Structures are given as C-alpha cells and as structure tokens.
Curated annotation (Swiss-Prot):
Protein name per UniProt: Epsilon-sarcoglycan
Membrane topology classification: Single-pass membrane protein
Parts of the chain on the Extracellular side: 1-317
Its job: Component of the sarcoglycan complex, a subcomplex of the dystrophin-glycoprotein complex which forms a link between the F-actin cytoskeleton and the extracellular matrix.
Glycosylated residues (UniProt): 200
Post-translational modification: N-glycosylated. Ubiquitinated, leading to its degradation by the proteasome.
Keyword line: Cell membrane, Cell projection, Cytoplasm, Cytoskeleton, Glycoprotein, Golgi apparatus, Membrane, Transmembrane, Transmembrane helix, Ubl conjugation
Species this chain originates from: Mus musculus (Mouse)
Amino acid sequence: MLLFWWWELGDPCAWTGKGRGTLKMSPATTGTFLLTVYTLFSKVHSDRNVYPSAGVLFVHVLEREYFKGEFPPYPKPGEVSNDPITFNTNLMGYPDRPGWLRYIQRTPYSDGVLYGSPTAENVGKPTIIEITAYNRRTFETARHNLIINIMSAEEFPLPYQAEFFIKNMNVEEMLASEVLGDFLGAVKNVWQPERLNAINITSALDRGGRVPLPINDMKEGVYVMVGADVAFSSCLREVENPQNQLRCSQEMEPVITCDKKFRTHFHIDWCKISLVDKTKQVSTYQEVVRGEGILPDGGEYKPPSDSLKSRDYYTDFLVTLAVPSAVALVLFLILAYIMCCRREGVEKRDMQTPDIQLVHHSSIQKSTKELRDMSKNREIAWPLSTLPVFHPVTGEVIPPTHTDNYDSTNMPLMQAQQNLPHQTQIPQPQTTGKWYP
C-alpha cells in the first residue's frame, strides 16, 4: 500500500517547473523498480540457513528442480525442462570448500550433494558456502548462498564408534535419507544403543580403492562410521575372534551371526570393520603452559673490540698456490723428457730391423708408388712388377721389357694377353667333328 501511494505522488527528488514531487513515474520506470525490488527479495530468499551438529553427518542436496526457475527464459506453468545443470561450491572468499565438507554429482542430470562431518573447531562460526549453478545448454548461471551454523552436540564425540564397509553401494546412493535410515535401523537392531548417529560417510575411492569395472552393476563401496553411547554388542565383537581373523587373513568371509540382518540390502565386508573405543584411549594432549613472554636475561652484550690483531697470510699463500704449482712443474718436466729425450729415431730403428724385412718393406713401397703413378696416367706401359718373370712351361727367364712399338693400353685384356711373346696358348673348344677318347 505504501508502494502504491509513493508511485502516485511521484519521485520526491524529481524537479520540474511546478516544484518538487509532482513528476509521475512512467510505466517503464515502474517496471524497472519492481524488478529491482524482486531481485533484492529473491537474493535474500536465496540465502538458506542450516544448523548441523558437530560430529554428526551433515547432508544437503542441491536439487536441480530448485535452480531451473533461475535460468531465463523462465519456464511456463506445466512446462518441463531437462537442461544439464552442474554446480560449483566453495567457501566464500576462498577457491575451495572447508576440509570437512565434500561434494559429489555423478552427471549433469542428477542432483548434487554436499556432505561431511562438521568439526568442533567451527562451532559457533557461520560457514557461508557459495553455490553456483551452471546451465550447460544456455550457459546461464545462478548463485545462492548456504549458511551453515554448526551447533555443539550434547555428547561429542560418542564414546563407541564403528566403521562399516558396504560393498554394494555408491556414496550418493548411501547419502539418500531412506537408504541411510534403513542402514541405521539395521545397526540399531544389532547394537541396541540409546543414541545412534551417523558420523561420517567416505567413498572407497577416497581410501585408495579402485574404480570398479562397468559390468554386473559393480559399485565403488562406501565406508560408513556410526557412533553410539553403549559398548559394542557381542555380534560386532565376533569379528575379533581368532577364527574369523584367520579366515580374513586367508581372504575368506568370516562367520558373523548377525550378518543376515544386513544381507537383505547391504553387503558388508566384515574383515574391514573397525571398532574404536574412545573410553580406553589415553589422551596424548599436553596442556601448554604459557609464560610471561619475557626472554631470560643473558647478561650484558659485549661487542668485539675495534683493534683487531694483524694476521700473516704468507704461509697460507704458499700452501695454497706454491705447492700445487711446484707439483705441476715437476710433472711437466717428466712428460717433456719422455716425449723429447726418449725417442728412438729412424736410424736406430733401421739398424735394429733385419735386412730381409727392410727389403720386403722397400718393395711394397715401390709397388705402391708405381700403382699411384699408374692411376695418374693410364697411357704408360705396364709396370715391371706385373710382368711374368719365368715362362710357365719352359721355365726360361723372360726379361721384363716391352718393345718400343708395343702399346697395349688401348687393347682389350684378352687380346693383349694373346699377343704377348712367350704366352702359353689356351686350347679352344671344337664346335664340329667327333670326339675320340
């Protein structure tokens, strides 16, 4: 009603020729003002307060249906949209969530879940979690704030705690209220305490477990910790029997009498159950005794005197430079004597070498020289070293000389061999005629 009268009177801060407060608001201005007021009220409405207890499991579901109306174009009444939506959660002013708070969302078409066990250090301190929703189809965003006010529990922590490993569950399935309620009901039938609370839920992947194969509907597994105010029942104590411990060491299932109460919906690995009795644990906490904050008196400060004694570094110089230099000089002289004064020389080597070896070496050098000269000029006569010395049939000595008008450099090899004097004739095969033995 006040808003209606304010709109009729106009803007009191507007100035016209007739005075102040006589200007009417246009419909566009009115619409903008109403949209601003609606935005402010919707932002206040988006901040949600929750009051979990320290040491008790906290679960908050981020429903996609709740955020669908935040993205334009706004759906009409009765219209159903199935846009993919993901969430990003962080502590206000920080890039990540608190250490005790976890978040999981399997697919953009499923709801997100915030879960964890608040600690006693945050009791009385409001924890503001920024929740940003992303519409993956329209790329629109919406941001809400979740204010977590952690309350102190009556009995924290509960003295008796048991951790179960459920093999046929994923963490988001176990966080459902009806599933978690069924599990706590089964534990209560076995344990029969007066108070029973779920303390924490952890995925097996966070404990180093393997990702299951996508066959036979395999699950990751979940660790569920519960606490009670009475001692463990005899059924839970059966895991500590030597027979069951032996079966667990052999990778066999232990025999537990109360397993049938869980087997309907929950497959528990009894070898991984953990029983913790807080009443028998010795506290290692030592109270810190704070002093006055004054350091003990160490006496009067005495700085070093201005007149320092002179120090001679000549000996240090000799040890550091002179000694290595002298050793290097001696080694250099020894090396020079070996390289320069201990050489045999060519004459001494020839005197110690036999004559036959020298002649053989000299003939090899001469032949090598002739071959090199041939490669430079191929129009010269054959070298003497390639001519035959003895006739292969008669054994006569043939002088290794050529006639002056004999030139075989341009003659084929076979023809040159046939024209040589004293050359043995090679018999030619007969093409016609008879053959007689």
